[in-house]
Amino acid sequence: MGYGQVDHSDREMMALALGQARASLEAGGVPVGAVLAAGSASQGWQLIAAGHNERVQRGDPVAHGEISCLRNAGRRSSYARTTLYTTLSPCQMCSGAILLFQIPRVVVGEAQTFEGDLGFLADRGVQIVLLDDPGCKAVMREFQERYPQLWSEDIGGR
């Protein structure tokens, strides 16, 4: 599949994910938010779940934004018509979850702060849409300035 086009609902859904990222930042955590939606560009998207990184808040090293969102979605028989919106490019663990659940489309707010594994996902048939969203970049910059030690402990130290 590779890289795809932005549809009319992508920015609206990304705004919800960004709200999740801001909630994490205000709680002293890593500002990565995610939402899972079902539907299509022609029929519109319906929100299934939202979540944000809670690695710091819960002391849980695997509570990344995407994982928290998927956990909040609960059990589903299929992810075939879903899109995962994430404010930052997914790491290897989150990319693995995307592949495991066969989520066909991922919309990424920004990949400048952390490139993640977008090529890995695209090579395996996941449609990637990169929004290059200024709000997503800004929340990561604010986090890096406010919590430099936490940033270096997380993906900033790699």
Locate predicted features.
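Zinc-dependent deaminase
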Residues: 1-24, 80, 90, 96-158
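A structural microfeature
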Residues: 48-51
